[in-house]
């Protein structure tokens, strides 16, 4: 039995409580502040970042939004066009569900790709074939990568998204985010030498599955 159950269902924006309107900043009916990809509000010299600009409400997203806003402001002040051109790319925000096992993902999902009519090639590596996962006694889970498989990619499509289910998935999702940021393809990731035995090498294995060169996947059960 329990004496108390705490249900946390999200955050409520306080845009209507900070007198933003007195500075001319527009606030939505729900209390959010709309910004562009440089984190500017409707008032060009005022920026906003974090939960108040909308989903996803994540600390690491807010930090990078702050970096963008600071770079743009500094670039304009110093006359540095490279800094002034900084922009926030929302497609490379990793998300983690801190459950047991953990679930982590970044970039495009299969459902999103299907909805957008994007043809993808999937590489899925089961942790049941991971030496480290087996040694840990936690081989439930998998690593999945999605690559552009459109005709224009000519078989060398860049990575569009990826996800992991398993222990410490959140600690490893950053590598997939970096691969998306750098425009890596399956060969790039598969040829990256990962230490063995580690959970992280499942990322390289998943890329090899997509490429058709993985030799570590167990045969399908009959």
What are these model-derived regions, one by one?
Residues 40-41, 45, 89-90, 136-138:
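Solvent-exposed alpha-helices and their adjacent loops that cap or buttress functional pockets
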Residues 4-82, 171, 175-177:
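FAD-site-proximal beta/loop scaffold in flavoenzymes
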